[in-house]
Amino acid sequence: MTIDFLKIKDSLSKKRIELQNNDKLLLRFIADNKYIDDVTAKILLNKKSDRAFWDRIKKLISYNYIRKTRITINSADWNAKPELLTAFSLDTQGCKLFGKEKIKTVGVQGEHLKHNLYVRRVAAIVERFRIDENGNKNELLNYETESVLDDYNDERIYIDKKNKYKIRPDILIRNLNLLIEIELNIKPDHKHYGKRLFWSQYLKEYDKTVWLVSSQKDKERLIKIFMNYAGESFKYDSVLDKKMIFSDAADKNLVVVLDDFFSTPETFLSLWTGLN
């Protein structure tokens, strides 16, 4: 008789650790997004103290559900000094649970990764907000992130015959017509934001956009850009005439500082969605 030691180990492991609902939420999120940073993990596990959080993380690591690594991010904002972030990906048991292959690398360096981690953090807050005390999910708050918005990949705004403009929102709550954009660096090309106002009004009819920015200065700058574009016209098709950006477009695009959002996220989400 042949003894399968791997099955014995798996069996013992399952007896010694029982996955809680928040564990499953965390693992599902990692499975969907490939990796996760420690702040987002804490939001999903809903642990009030660092000790409780890390005790649970160590438990999940010890039974091969997740792996811990350190990501180096080089950012001009930090004078090119490397910043290390704690990140997690699925390990052996986690991959088995969701039928995923073991992830060998975690993310990429630079601003792109920094932006993605912020998107995951905000998405994690939306995920917690949509679940009630009984673990039921509010379907109105089903959301999609840029990585899965395949039907947006070919969206174009035609400014003129030579220029094409493609947009994929960071987070889309489709049932509520709500877009959430994380904008860590306000671009010097102001036309970028004029195109966004135009796109949300005419091409997809999503005129409810929340812009999460990194500072109060960026907030003031972006609001001013939006106000200056009120009444501007854009041509998005070679056949159709130019159309105007509504004069109240700036009022329909909310700008919020990220730190303010993270301090009381439930308050902001209740305000934006009309849900408690």
Segments (PLM) and residue ranges:
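Nuclease-adjacent, charged terminal/linker segments that flank catalytic cores
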Residues: M1-V106
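Non-catalytic C-terminal interaction segments of nucleic acid-processing enzymes
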Residues: K15-E18, K24-L27, G194, K204-K208, ...
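Hydrophobic, Leu/Ile/Phe/Ala-enriched alpha-helical segments that form helix-helix packing faces
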Residues: L45, I57, I61, V122-E133, ...
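Active-site metal-binding core of divalent-cation-utilizing nuclease and nuclease-like domains
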Residues: W78, A123-A124, N134-L179, L184-H190
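Amphipathic alpha-helical dimerization/coiled-coil segments
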Residues: Q93-Y143
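Mg2+/Mn2+-dependent nuclease catalytic core
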Residues: I186-K204
